[in-house]
Amino acid sequence: MKVFHLLLRRLTFTLLSLSLLIFHQSAPAETRLSGNHFLSAELLNLSKDLTMNPIALWLDQGSQIWQKDCQGCHQDLTQVRQSIVEFPRWKNHQLINLEDQIIQCFAKKQMVGLSTENQDVIALSTFLSDSAKGLKIKLQPPSEVAERKLWQEELNHGAQIYIQRQGRVNLSCTQCHDLNIGKNLRSDVISPAFLTGFPIYRQSWQTMGSMDRRLRACYSGVQAAIPPTGHRDLRALELFLKNRSEGLLWEGPSIRR
């Protein structure tokens, strides 16, 4: 009987995961609203004011890093723009996101031991994210059959995390970001979980933060065990969120309360 219930639970997770994937992939892009649609008038004005938007500080720093450490290899920024909207990507049998790629590139220049939230990493991520603004989000699954199967397993894993109740609060991602869109939670307006603009500047952080930091904050909010930065669960969840955002326009680094 235990085995039967376990199999039934897994089947339920699989069916729910597939239904989420199919629903969001089939929904027209114009019917899906990004987080920017739910900003207060104050934050929306701040995001549009280039003289006051704090993200400009990280853009300037990222531009300097690009010219100093990256331009010699990549030359034209337009050559890397498209790849920004394709992360997380499959590399060496695992998922990596934009910050992972930056850390790997820095390591080649003997800049080792950097974390995802390192200010140089975040600044360059902010600059590159901004360069891809306006492009359509489009993932690039691996072409090789065996690798594609592993990639799909990670996507399914992310979908299961999304619908799994977490922590002492016993909430799942879908309960907030699909079933309670537009409602207030701790002074924040709940938006759909479409990944269209990162890194983000959160006023409550007073700094820029990566997707990892935002997801880990959600784990903390529901009082669940928090995965370490770069954990497989975080990458799989990011892949799922990016997958359901396919077809939407990338908005670049964003501001939140």
Tell me what each language-model feature is.
Residues 3, 7-8, 17-57, 89-156, ...:
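Post-cleavage N-terminal segment of exported redox proteins
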Residues 68-78, 124, 158, 170-180, ...:
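The canonical Cys-X-X-Cys-His
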Residues 85-93, 189-197:
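Short cysteine/histidine-rich metal-coordination sites, predominantly Zn2+-binding motifs
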Residues 64, 158-163, 172, 185, ...:
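Long compositionally biased, domain-poor regions of proteins
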Residues 50-78:
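N-terminal, post-signal-peptide region of Sec/Tat-exported proteins
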Residues 63, 129-184:
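Surface-exposed interaction/gating patches
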Residues 80-84, 183-187:
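Short Cys/His-rich "knuckle" micro-motifs
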